[in-house]
Amino acid sequence: MTLDSYDKLLGTVLQEYKILSEYKRLQNEDLGGLYVIPSFENSFLWFGVIFVRSGPYKDGVFRFTVSLPDKFPNDATVPTVVFQSETFHPLIDPYNGTLELAEAFPKWKSGENHVWQLLKFIQYIFASFDEYMSLAEQSANNVAYELYGQNRPEFLRKVEECVRLGQSRLYDPAPVQDRNYIVFDRFDRETHGPVLESLKQGKANEVTTPPSSGLSWVKEGVFQPLSKQG
């Protein structure tokens, strides 16, 4: 192995370590309702899904991807977030699903900016939507932005449509062949029943789970993972 090859390999290993560290940081953040995991095939691509718990988008389930730039984190280029289904939101491009991040992250600052901050921003623009709109100065969807200010009932109608669309696609087959793609399975009493009962009894930590199949489950009609019944 030449010196140049060794340096290149070392640089790749260090970069992978930094990406892994970014993912590990998520464990210390309050990202309730938002789930991400790096692709098995490509650590620069992360799969995500957010279950919105409040605001106009409540009960919405929206899939997205996070793409890290080639030189991450030592690059001023901001990661790219793309929503996978039509999401009617002032910050989401209606044609390609790209989330507008320029206002929140004008450029990426290594050591100062982290992926968890980007994910927190995604949480914020859905769960605290009205607060966000009171501060927003940029838009990727002018129709959504103008309707919010000029015709609130029509805006909410379109939001409800995209919420229903996201719910209807929750169980769609994975569009890519990747072991880490987040897939949801319909509730199965034999497989998921013991976990649900333990959750209801406050004994989730005592459950012995079988080997992972790569699937998560959501009770049909209740759009929260591992939902408890009242």
From Swiss-Prot:
Gene3D superfamilies: Ubiquitin Conjugating Enzyme (3.10.110.10). Transmembrane segments: none annotated. CDD domains: UEV_AKTIP. Disulfide bonds: none annotated. It comes from the Eukaryota. Pfam families: UQ_con (PF00179). SUPFAM superfamilies: UBC-like. InterPro entries: Ub_conjugating_enzyme, UBQ-conjugat_E2_core, UBQ-conjugating_enzyme/RWD. Residues 14-168 form the UBC core domain. Belongs to the ubiquitin-conjugating enzyme family. FTS subfamily. This is Protein crossbronx homolog.
